Amino acid sequence: EAREVSFRSLKKMSAAERNASLAAGTLGISFYEWIDERFNLPQPDLIDLSKERERPDVAARLLRQHWGLGDRPIGNLLKLYEAKGIRVLSLSENTRNVDAYSFWHSDSPYMFLNQQKTAERSNFDSAHELAHLVLHFHVDAATAPTEDAEKQADQFASAFLMPEADIKGRIGHVY
């Protein structure tokens, strides 16, 4: 449902882009329902970190620990997400001003990414959406404190992609 999807930047997004994105969500659900009936996909392995909303860096560290990632860089984020049961799909070309969005449907997490961005931007967008899945999935998008939720997701994404321990270890060798 549209009310369950929260878009990051509504300023640049046209109504047509919003509608195309929501249509992609509907098609993505149908696609994965078909796949789920025929194949044994990984079950979602996400933990509810909503209690750590005010400490996104802690939430990122807890999820990395839960997934056994340690503090080293992650090689292939999309492969990791899919292995952890997240249904990852691409947005179409007619959604240029939509960065990404995510939602839960029937106990399955979905993530839609704009592949017209740089790899670095796509990685950040995907980690940002991961934050929404683990920090905000109990919050109705219509009533969520959007600005706070976006800041929390940005902080989570930064900490998830570049853990403090790894950065400090690398910087220590530089200086």
Describe the role of every protein-language-model region.
Residues E1-Y175:
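Short juxta-domain linker segments that transition from a proline/glycine-rich
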